[in-house]
């Protein structure tokens, strides 16, 4: 989904490539050499990190299921309503949480700048949680973010990506991916049709 969103927002893609060039260099070889000698440079890719966080906000991973333990009341109250939670499993809807306008202004917009340090409107603690929190926290979160940063670095410096769905393909709402609307029942968001793309080598 990151490639799709960046294709739809070329101004953000330009800013991202500028950051890559300033931090690690303008070609694959310079990037590899820079990361081998100074892997901490990945920490300087603030916009890259923000792009990944915003992508995961809009297209989050599957929820963590939590089985409710037996409690004395076995009932909870939420927004004036009472729920019986005996022997139930509770799941957090990340899609709903991540698109709340009180937590993320203009929630349907792809705006990675909201995640940059010093953003005008700070994001409340625990509002962004595609890797979940507490006992359900994903221990591989940091590794996953590092891998995705390196992937964007090495691909965007050399290639352009353009979605290429057939005209007869079913289309969903643009805010949920358009032709690449989320489908399937796996742990992560699966684009409809596999998100076919045309990949072009960038001119030097």
Swiss-Prot record:
The protein's required cofactor(s) are namely:
heme
Record keyword Oxidoreductase present: yes
Top enzyme class, one word, equals: oxidoreductase
Role noted for this protein: Cytochrome P450 monooxygenase; part of the gene cluster that mediates the biosynthesis of the indole diterpenes penitrems. The geranylgeranyl diphosphate (GGPP) synthase penG catalyzes the first step in penitrem biosynthesis via conversion of farnesyl pyrophosphate and isopentyl pyrophosphate into geranylgeranyl pyrophosphate (GGPP). Condensation of indole-3-glycerol phosphate with GGPP by the prenyl transferase penC then forms 3-geranylgeranylindole (3-GGI).
Its family remark reads: Belongs to the cytochrome P450 family.
Gene3D superfamilies assigned to the protein according to its UniProt record, in alphabetical order: Cytochrome P450
Q: Does the keyword Oxidoreductase apply?
A: yes
Which pathway features in its UniProt record? Answer: Secondary metabolite biosynthesis
Residues where heme binds = 138
Query: What stretches pass through the bilayer?
Result: none
Q: What is its EC number?
A: 1.-.-.-
What Pfam families does UniProt report for this protein, alphabetically?
A: p450 (PF00067)
GO MF annotation, one: monooxygenase activity
Q: What is this protein called?
A: Cytochrome P450 monooxygenase PC-23
Q: Which gene encodes it?
A: PC-23
List keywords of the entry alphabetically: Heme, Iron, Metal-binding, Monooxygenase, Oxidoreductase
GO biological process: any one? Answer: mycotoxin biosynthetic process
């Amino acid at each position: 989904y990151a490639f799709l969103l960046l294709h739809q927002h070329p101004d953000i893609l330009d800013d991202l490539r500028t950051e890559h060039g300033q931090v690690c260099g303008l070609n694959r070889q310079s990037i590899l050499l820079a990361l081998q000698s100074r892997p901490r440079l990945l920490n300087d890719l603030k916009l890259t990190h923000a792009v990944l966080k915003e992508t995961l906000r809009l297209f989050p991973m599957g929820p963590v299921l939590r089985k409710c333990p037996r409690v004395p009341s076995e009932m909870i109250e939420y927004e004036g309503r009472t729920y019986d939670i005996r022997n139930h499993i509770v799941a957090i809807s990340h899609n709903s949480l991540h698109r709340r306008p009180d937590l993320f202004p203009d929630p349907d917009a792809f705006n990675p700048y909201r995640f940059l340090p010093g953003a005008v409107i700070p994001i409340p603690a625990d509002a962004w949680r595609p890797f979940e929190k507490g006992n359900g926290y994903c221990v591989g979160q940091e590794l996953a973010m590092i891998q995705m940063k390196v992937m964007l670095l090495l691909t965007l410096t050399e290639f352009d990506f353009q979605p290429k769905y057939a005209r007869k393909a079913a289309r969903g709402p643009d805010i949920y991916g358009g032709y690449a609307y989320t489908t399937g029942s796996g742990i992560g968001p699966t684009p409809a049709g596999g998100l076919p793309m045309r990949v072009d080598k960038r001119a030097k």
